[in-house]
Each structure stands twice: as structure tokens, then as C-alpha cells.
């Protein structure tokens, strides 16, 4: 007698601003998962995505096309994309009919890059909420470009956006600093990498901003934003280079812990293996240190020395 098809499915909702590397992440992660023996289905939820580099199991473009919407309704790219997401929200039976035959696969959802969809517009959140009711356990994987760390003002903005996304999307959440191999192409980091990944004492960033004549006028605003971020104490990041298998493994370990895949029934796992997967994501200092040595130029001063000079 054949076993029943699994009812619970797992996956990642890959979100983030345009250019953060979502599609490249889906390609790299899908190849990595297949190498581990997982059956993977990549679902494109971005109607603006063209020339996809990965094999697409489900494409929202079959339901609604961004170009057609823009022409028919005389909308711009942003307005057209919002309409497409609202149209998908109103036709979730189409999406479920596409996903149900793929039960037993691990899903990667390549989502649109418009920030408002993840910070205050309700369509994408409603779609995710409905999928969880279909017993699809998702982790939101939020990518932001790592080069924002080189600019204190932009990093504070990234922290605010990440926090707003975490509160709005309402899914288990993993934040990634993508393109780690390019992190210092736009300037040197003021602090060690773990300062940014663990979001340590942000008062140091305020001191750096105070040295800029433009941002000195906005010190009180920046202080309030920093206080808000620290009061919630939710945001942290995992550094990612999608070309580095060890880096992908660290991300996957955190995602598996967040959506419960490491405790799933599809694979036989010993208690030791499950505890290793569950706990390992919390102790990645050595991995972060290794990435710093690999991608960042040696710093001549410590954080404490720099702080004393401010």
C-alpha cells in the first residue's frame, strides 16, 4: 500500500528590495538543496521577473502579467505590481491548484521587490497567511545589500525597514546581508562585521553620523530611530555569499530552525542531529569571524580605539 502524500510542506518566502539578490538566492539555494537530496519547487510570485535563471515550477505570470496590467489600466510599474498582487490575492484558488500537486517538495517563493508590499500593503501578507492555513510552513528570508553597512545613515534605514518588515509580514524571519563578497566595494566598514550582524550598541553609529555636517542636524531623529530599534531588539543579520557553500549552509540552518523543518517527519533524524540543527544557528560567531577575514580588509584600529577618538 502506497504511503499517503505528506500534508505539511516547508519553504522560504524570499523578500527584499530590488537588486538585493532574491532571484540569484533562489537559484543558488535551490541548487544547494537539491545537492542535499531535497526535492525543490521554485515559485515565481514576481510578475516583473523575466528571463528567470532557474527552473520555475509555478509562475504567477501565467495568471497575470505586469505589462498587460500596465497597458490595460494605464498604471506605472509600482501601481501595476500592486494590482497584480491584489489580483493574486483574489485568485488564491489558482495558486493552491498549482501548489497542491507539489506536496512533498520544499518551496522557494521568489517575491516582488517593492518594499511597500512588505512594510504596509496587505496583499502579500494575506497571501502568506493563506498559505500557512494550507499547512505550508514558511520562513521569510529578507535580503538586504551588505554594502549599506558602509554608510551609517543607510544602515539605520535598513534596520528600520527590516524591523517594519518583520512586524508586518508575520512569519518566522531570517534577515540576510547579501553579496558579502562585495561589501567593501563602496567603502570600508567603521566596525567589525559582528557589530552589524548582531546589531550591537548603535550609539557608536550616532557618533559617526554626528561627524557629518548634514546628519548632525538630524541627531534627535536618528536617536529616536535607534531607540525604537533597540527597544524591539528583534533585528539581526546573517552574512551571505551565495557562491560560498558554508555561508549557504549557515543560512539554511537558521531557516530550518525557524520553520521547523529540522524537526520534520519527512527525514529520519536522530535527537543529536535535530538539536545540532536547532541550536547551531545561535552560535555562529566563528563563522562570522571567518567571513570577516575572507571579505574585509584588515582593520588597523579596534572599535574601542575608534570610539575613543570620536
Curated annotation (Swiss-Prot):
Residues that hold GTP according to the record: 19-24, 178-181
UniProt motif (Gly-Pro-Asn (GPN)-loop) ranges: 76-78
Residue numbers of N-acetylalanine PTMs: 2
Q: Which CDD domains match?
A: GPN2
> Superkingdom of the source?
Eukaryota
Note the SUPFAM superfamilies from the entry: P-loop containing nucleoside triphosphate hydrolases
Record site: Stabilizes the phosphate intermediate: 78
Gene3D superfamilies, from UniProt? Answer: P-loop containing nucleotide triphosphate hydrolases
MF GO annotations: GTP binding; GTPase activity
Q: Which Pfam families match?
A: ATP_bind_1 (PF03029)
Which regions form coiled coils?
none
The record's similarity note reads: Belongs to the GPN-loop GTPase family.
Instruction: Give the record's subunit note.
Output: Heterodimers with GPN1 or GPN3. Binds to RNA polymerase II (RNAPII).
This protein is called what?
Answer: GPN-loop GTPase 2
Amino acid at each position: 500500500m502506497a504511503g499517503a502524500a505528506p500534508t505539511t510542506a516547508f519553504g522560504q518566502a524570499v523578500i527584499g528590495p530590488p537588486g538585493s539578490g532574491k532571484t540569484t538566492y533562489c537559484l543558488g539555494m535551490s541548487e544547494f538543496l537539491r545537492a542535499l537530496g531535497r526535492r525543490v519547487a521554485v515559485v515565481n510570485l514576481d510578475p516583473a521577473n523575466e528571463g528567470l535563471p532557474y527552473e520555475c515550477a509555478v509562475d504567477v505570470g501565467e495568471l497575470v502579467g505586469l505589462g498587460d496590467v500596465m497597458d490595460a489600466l494605464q498604471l506605472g510599474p509600482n501601481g501595476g505590481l500592486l494590482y497584480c498582487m491584489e489580483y493574486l490575492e483574489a485568485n488564491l484558488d489558482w495558486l493552491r491548484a498549482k501548489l497542491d500537486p507539489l506536496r512533498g517538495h520544499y518551496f522557494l517563493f521568489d517575491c516582488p521587490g517593492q518594499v511597500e508590499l512588505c512594510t504596509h500593503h496587505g496583499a502579500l501578507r494575506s497571501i502568506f497567511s493563506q498559505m500557512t492555513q494550507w499547512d505550508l510552513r514558511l520562513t521569510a528570508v529578507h535580503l538586504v545589500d551588505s554594502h549599506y553597512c558602509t554608510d551609517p545613515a543607510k544602515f539605520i534605514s535598513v534596520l528600520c525597514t527590516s524591523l517594519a518588515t518583520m512586524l508586518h509580514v508575520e512569519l518566522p524571519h531570517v534577515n540576510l546581508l547579501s553579496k558579502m563578497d562585495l561589501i567593501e566595494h563602496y567603502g570600508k566598514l567603521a566596525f567589525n562585521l559582528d557589530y552589524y550582524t548582531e546589531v550591537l550598541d548603535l550609539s557608536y553609529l550616532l557618533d559617526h553620523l554626528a561627524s557629518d555636517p548634514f546628519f548632525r542636524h538630524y541627531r534627535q531623529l536618528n536617536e529616536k530611530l535607534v531607540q525604537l530599534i533597540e527597544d524591539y531588539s528583534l533585528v539581526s543579520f546573517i552574512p551571505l555569499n551565495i557562491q560560498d557553500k558554508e555561508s549557504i549552509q549557515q543560512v539554511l540552518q537558521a531557516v530550518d530552525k525557524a520553520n521547523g523543518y529540522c524537526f520534520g517527519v519527512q527525514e529520519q533524524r536522530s535527537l543529536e542531529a535535530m538539536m545540532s540543527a536547532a541550536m547551531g544557528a545561535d552560535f555562529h560567531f566563528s563563522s562570522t569571524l571567518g567571513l570577516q577575514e575572507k571579505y574585509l580588509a584588515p582593520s588597523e584600529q579596534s572599535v574601542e580605539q575608534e570610539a575613543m577618538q570620536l
